[in-house]
Amino acid sequence: MELMTVLLPLAALVSGVLFTWLLMKGRFQGEFADLNAQLAEKAARCDFVEQAHAEIASELAVLDGKYRHLQDENYALGNRFSAAEKQIAHLQEKEAESVRLKQSYIELQEKAQGLAVENERLATQLGQERKAFADQYALERQIRQRIETDLEESRQTVRDVQNDLADVGNRFAAAEKQIAHLQEKEAEAERLRQSHTELQEKAQGLAVENERLATQIEQERLASEEKLSLLGEARKSLSDQFQNLANTILEEKSRRFTEQNREQLHQVLNPLNERIQGFGELVKQTYDKESRERLTLENELKRLQGLNAQLHSEAKALTNALTGTQNKVQGNWGEMILETVLENSGLQKGREYVVQAASVRKEEDGGTRRLQPDVLVNLPDNKQIVIDSKVSLTAYVRYTQAADADTAARELAAHVASIRAHMKGLSLKDYTDLEGVNTLDFVFMFIPVEPAYLLALQNDAGLFQECFDKRIMLVGPSTLLATLRTVANIWRNEQQNQNALAIADEGGKLYDKFVGFVQTLESVGKGIDQAQNSFQTAFKQLAEGRGNLVGRAEKLRLLGVKANKQLARDLTERANETTALSESLEYVAEDEAV
């Protein structure tokens, strides 16, 4: 009963709690459903916003691309508009020329029929130009319409004046000649621009060469400084060793030398000092020569820096030579270019190369033939290189001025044939048999115009081999300059080798002299030792031992021998002491014997 009393309230409490929980659960579920609905709505809105944002971003990207495309089109249209304005100006010039022709046509009305055909050709040409301009500038409609209007007006003007044309054929022919002349001038201007481009390339090449030479000069300077440093250290080391050795020997023997021995030693040392001074002079001369060579290289670098300015004047001279027809003038110009290359190669005129050196050659019939090569380049070991300048430019000039491919091919063949003819003529001279000249097995044939030289080799692959078979080497300015610079370096190395041999020879002589000096000095020392031993023996006989000369002489004085001089006291005392000591030793020896 009591249990029921307790359980009933508890059950009621539990029921209330469950009921309350169910009510709260239903409320919470409703609120949770509302929250889920709100979240779903917000998620849908977010998706919509993101989709809209993506669409806006896509549209912005498309608009940005269109904007850039429009900018590019605007830039292209601007360029085309500028080009069209230039064409319009050109057409306006042509229109002005048409007006001038119209005035000429009005003045000369008798030959209208002859000009009609030409006017039709001009109209056709203008139509072709109009079509080309229309195709090229399709986007510029207003400009195209203006061009078409101008062309139509020009054609109408031409048609209006056709009935009034007179003696205009000659004038129009003159105009055609003038146009052809202008075209030639334009072609010449194009060639000059190409020449200018080539000169700029050469200038760039020279700049690279300048940098290379500067690097080479710096390397040679460092090598020379290192050599001089080593020579200076060797000289200082040898001098210190000689001085230390001489001082050591002199310090050991100085207390034994007499005035006569010192004089003899000076006589022995003087040749050694002279050799050392000669070695120092040789080192100084080597340093001065290296300094002069560095100065020569610096001057050469300055000349190379000024070569760009010289090329401009040489280009003008080249133009005059190309347009000239006198072979003598072209030959002189080729020799001038050859001498310019030689001057810039670093070789010394008159010493390492000779210009226009005359010589003779014996013929098979017993006679002699006088030959005069343009340049003889001397090599070490009494060898020479023969260089002969050959200018072959007439056909080359016509080739550069050719109006069509057939003419160009014909003139190119003539240019190669001209070079081959020069080569055959040079091979007949046979410079290798000149008296007093020890040439190599081949001769350099110098072509002063680099493009003409390269053009011939590029279009005739067998030309170089044919020249080589005839012991002729084809060279242009660049290849010859590289070869001559190599020869200059060979001469510098030869001079340095000769200096090194001279230094080695002087060093060998110095070493031999030093060995002789040491041997002589050893002999002097031995002689001094022998003299010292003889001196000690003689001194013992004089003042030491029993019966020495000083004691005997002093006894004679004490016995009454008349003398004007007297021996030194310390010498007589020493003689008496040694005599007494000797007698005492003899007495002791006798007592021991007894």
UniProtKB/Swiss-Prot annotation:
Residues 31-330 form a coiled coil. The keyword tRNA processing does not apply. It comes from the Bacteria. Keywords: Coiled coil, DNA recombination. InterPro entries: DNA_recombination_RmuC. GO terms for biological process: DNA recombination. Pfam families: RmuC. Belongs to the RmuC family. Involved in DNA recombination. This is DNA recombination protein RmuC homolog.
